[in-house]
């Protein structure tokens, strides 16, 4: 018996063997795309040479300038044992030179690079792909995003990069990293976008692209480009436990870099808007507890006094679901849209309060430079908790009990609330959110005990901190080398 299904259309037989294009032709087509992108982008990629004079060679942490192009990033430690000759610490030369990368974004001589490439340099020289050299006459930096713009002397009609749209990138997209790793000028490597939205310790105001395109010391500041030859990121750091490339690199999305660089070029600094709230991810349990099961949003845990949010009437336990019509579902997404909003203007913030939507008009203000950071001794953190700040070590701590920290249940200690960006703690790798359990062999469970434990300690003598992170226990030595 035969069964007929549907209409009596002619039968089409499908081959069991999949039909494919000529694999060599397909590979050649991809190779041609790489060649085209590299050819379009390389002319605008530059070598950034920074030099620090002898009297400034040693930084506060005792690290010689220039030997590590990743200095100041979360990954500088990975290169201390793996640097090539000429980059080794204590090199003994009367002055030190560093080499990084950059990309020309304005034909009149504006180069975009990383802050850590030019930070602290007495002299910066830019070398173009055609061999021409220019002196930097002005450098503007934004350490919070690790970006800098360099203005060149007597430059005109320079080759400029085409800037793409990093928001359009999709995981799996092909990209090229271009730069000067280990002083090998105009090196091109290929890879894909491995992930988006990565966050890295000390660089608080950037959300990184992750790529497996090879990035090494000297690549910092160079472009990550798509197959159209458009810059989609600024290569910044790698993750490695050996000092060598291990397939994980990070780049600042060009949309973010463009926003920062435009402000640096226009005014010399970056103004970011702020609300003045402590926020957290809204969990499913908390959403249900607040009467909004399944709701996505950002939970307001505290409203700081005398801030835009406080003036507007934002309340603790409000759930922010949109800002100026843009939905927000994570603390970082809210921070991004707020910091780029127009300062001095009113913005509609939609919150859920007692299960009902409420629209609050907030006049966003510029984020104060040291918001919440006390100068020394006891202070008050945003939200009202008492803190203790030690300037010699550059740490501000608060009691663990003052902040919900599920990762530290069962552990006593004090929470690192803030770290001076250029302080000894930052140089030692300490970051906000870490739990300090002991100073030396002395357990600390309150800011009083922490203050007593470091009494009389000096940066020159150093302190050993036993800490707890969400990944486990660690020990950090904070000591100023002299």
Language-model region placement:
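C-terminal recognition in membrane/secretory proteostasis and scaffolding
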Residues: 1-18, 23-27, 32-39, 52-53, ...
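Flexible, gly/ser-rich surface segments that form the specificity/activation loops bordering the active-site cleft
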Residues: 117, 161-165, 173-204, 241, ...
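A conserved glycine-rich beta-strand in the N-terminal activation segment of trypsin-fold
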Residues: 26-36, 88-110, 132-135, 159-162, ...
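Long amphipathic alpha-helical segments used for membrane anchoring, targeting, substrate engagement
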Residues: 58-91
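C-terminal subregion of chymotrypsin/trypsin-like serine protease catalytic domains
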Residues: 231-267, 272
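Short, acidic, Ser/Thr-enriched surface-loop or helix-capping motifs
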Residues: 99, 105-106, 128, 153, ...
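Catalytic nucleophile loop of clan PA
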Residues: 103, 214-234, 425
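Catalytic-histidine neighborhood of serine endopeptidases
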Residues: 60-63, 71, 107-108, 112-146, ...
